[in-house]
């Protein structure tokens, strides 16, 4: 199976966790896009969705799925999203698609976070994939200097603005042994909106696409 076929398999497998009549939290990226395709097939069974990006909102609306403002929803039954990396503790690096802040907000109000990914995203130690950090534009240089002090090599993601109007620094050269501590440390830097470490709030279930089918963890 190709990588895209593995992503499609886990996107459709996530339908098993969607309860009729609920509002579903939906992530961003190529794997989440397959979940939206799957969700379109049962759109009349759900109340709607909360979306983590303008791109996902547009795709949901193209299927006629109502999209709710996060402020109008107290709690979500599930949140389904991909990951750039996921370790054995169900901690993730996310934000390759620059939607990390909204993804983290939706994860916070969801009872269950379901990570959908192909097997290439499974790692022993987080950090080979550059760690995205969303930053207020005026703080970009300061935050970069602080990230260097932590041992990282930050790279400004050129020509990218988040849906919130901020910039992204991708931090290379990190071997993340204590993801919770690093998440808290980077989030404490003035000017950081959030870091793409999902460790304090990791995944509850991981659906991993493999050549032998979908592996369920959690």
From Swiss-Prot:
EC number: 5.3.1.6
Keyword Isomerase set for record: yes
Pathway: Carbohydrate degradation; pentose phosphate pathway; D-ribose 5-phosphate from D-ribulose 5-phosphate (non-oxidative stage): step 1/1
Family: Belongs to the ribose 5-phosphate isomerase family.
Single GO term (MF): ribose-5-phosphate isomerase activity
Lineage: Bacteria, Pseudomonadati, Pseudomonadota, Gammaproteobacteria, Enterobacterales
Alphabetical keyword list: Isomerase
GO CC annotations on file: cytosol
InterPro entries: NagB/RpiA_transferase-like (IPR037171), Ribose5P_isomerase_typA_subgr (IPR020672), Ribose5P_isomerase_type_A (IPR004788)
Regions annotated as coiled coil: none
Annotated catalytic residues: 103 (proton acceptor)
Enzyme category, top tier: isomerase
Domain of life of the organism encoding this protein: Bacteria
Catalysed reactions listed for this entry: aldehydo-D-ribose 5-phosphate = D-ribulose 5-phosphate
UniProt name for this protein: Ribose-5-phosphate isomerase A 1
Record's subunit section: Homodimer.
Encoding gene, per UniProt annotation: rpiA1
Pfam families noted in UniProt: Rib_5-P_isom_A
Function: Catalyzes the reversible conversion of ribose-5-phosphate to ribulose 5-phosphate.
Residues annotated as binding substrate: 28-31, 81-84, 94-97, 121
């Amino acid at each position: 199976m190709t990588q895209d076929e593995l992503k499609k398999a886990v996107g459709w497998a996530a339908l098993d966790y969607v309860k009729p009549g609920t509002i579903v939290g939906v992530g961003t990226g190529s794997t989440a896009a397959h979940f939206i395709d799957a969700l379109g097939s049962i759109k009349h069974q759900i109340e709607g969705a909360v979306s983590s990006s303008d791109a996902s909102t547009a795709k949901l609306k193209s299927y006629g799925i109502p999209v709710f403002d996060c402020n109008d929803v107290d709690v979500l039954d599930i949140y389904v999203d991909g990951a750039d990396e996921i370790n054995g503790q169900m901690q993730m690096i996310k934000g390759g698609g620059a939607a990390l802040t909204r993804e983290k907000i939706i994860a916070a109000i969801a009872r269950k976070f379901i990570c959908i990914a192909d097997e290439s995203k499974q790692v022993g130690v987080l950090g080979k994939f550059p760690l995205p950090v969303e930053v207020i534009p005026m703080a970009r240089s300061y935050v970069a200097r602080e990230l260097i002090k932590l041992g990282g090599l930050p790279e400004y993601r050129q020509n990218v603005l988040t849906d919130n109007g901020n910039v992204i620094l991708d931090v290379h050269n990190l071997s993340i042994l204590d993801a919770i501590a690093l998440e808290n440390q980077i989030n404490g830097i003035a000017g950081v909106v959030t870091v793409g470490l999902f460790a304090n709030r990791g995944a509850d279930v991981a659906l991993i696409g493999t050549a032998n089918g979908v592996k369920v963890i959690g």
